[in-house]
């Protein structure tokens, strides 16, 4: 009886430790449901129904492995990816890495900020500029939580992730997708046309985000409590749960677009405004409002995450620190310039995804090299199977993004 109590007590303590260590992956997972994903998934679902759902499944599995490697690097070495690159690469290479990472962080933030502004415009009936002002105020308020430490921010970001997931459960109820066709689309690969290949590349490009690769290693490098193996075990659970939620949201986005648009003949729906306006008569005003609210939640949370990622790359690569509010102010400026110039916001979203594709391999290659180094990683070094899988992902992601870039350049 005494032994049972001791085991029960130790089991509760282990669960408590694991729970305390969870949270960083929920911040990273927000990068996988930003407005760029909304635009790409809606276009894919409207154009090809359920046929590209399998791409979301595989992209999410790849993203899970990448985020586990990023988190593991921080746990094993106590340094984030940007700091490891700074320590191991020549100075000119480090400066190149910093410049491209900053450009990518700003391009990401541009898409996320404008996405949230579009959401405010749709649900409140304000102008895009007024939506941008509301987005700026809201992100400043969320970033103020950072003063209280990482945990409060994790809770708010995690709450927004769960809100978006709940919103898409509601959208699925409204749209009532064909479950048999949905299941088939998730497991049977299909690329019926060259446009489908291009959209599949876009889905993958919008899913794997370089800025959260840098960020996740930073969020785990200062984790305390439990042994190193316990921290790694908790992190695997953290990533599995958070990325499963993000994967569900992406699947639900595409499935809703398929059920609501593709099978009603609206196969040309390609932007967020059009999706909102088309949802109202097809499903209901409530469905359109839920869509708008989910876009706001995803945009706000992902633009906060983008700001944090920008801070990490600056501190990691060049050891320079600026206050978060200064960075937030500077990175908002391109969004306001785009809006004031009257540029097409959906086109800007697509262009930002193309810019992101340049940074994916630049983040993935050193991540795989460092996490495969036994001197750096010790007992957390990558296994042979993980190394092989990792390099296959790198080759696949690079190939698909080259296809995406060429296709975009040719105007496909």
Curated annotation (Swiss-Prot):
Residues 40-51, 119-125, 176-196, 259-276, 345-350, 407-412 are periplasmic. The keyword Transmembrane helix applies. GO terms for cellular component: plasma membrane. It is found in: Cell inner membrane. Residues 1-19, 72-95, 146-155, 221-238, 298-327, 371-387 are cytoplasmic. The chain crosses the membrane at residues 20-39, 52-71, 96-118, 126-145, 156-175, 197-220, 239-258, 277-297, 328-344, 351-370, 388-406. Its main location: membrane. It comes from the Bacteria. Keywords: Cell inner membrane, Cell membrane, Ion transport, Membrane, Symport, Transmembrane, Transmembrane helix, Transport. It holds the Pfam family Nramp. GO terms for molecular function: cadmium ion transmembrane transporter activity; manganese ion transmembrane transporter activity; metal ion binding; symporter activity. It is a multi-pass membrane protein. H(+)-stimulated, divalent metal cation uptake system. Belongs to the NRAMP family. PANTHER family: NATURAL RESISTANCE-ASSOCIATED MACROPHAGE PROTEIN 2, SOLUTE CARRIER PROTEIN FAMILY 11 MEMBER. This is Divalent metal cation transporter MntH.
